[in-house]
Amino acid sequence: MSLLEYKILSSEGNKALPELEALVNHAISEGWEPQGGVMASEANISDTSFTTYLQAIIRRLP
């Protein structure tokens, strides 16, 4: 049985999706694998909308 390391990447703001793509691509280059799909969370505070995108990633340990 292999051990797994688990991490959640997140980004928010005007360039959230391109930023998350860059984070995920960098993680993939370091041996991480996306786990499941992207999650989007939206919050409204004082008439300001914030969207946060999240991606779970795993890495198999020796």
Which residue ranges define each predicted feature?
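Terminus-proximal functional modules
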Residues: 1-62
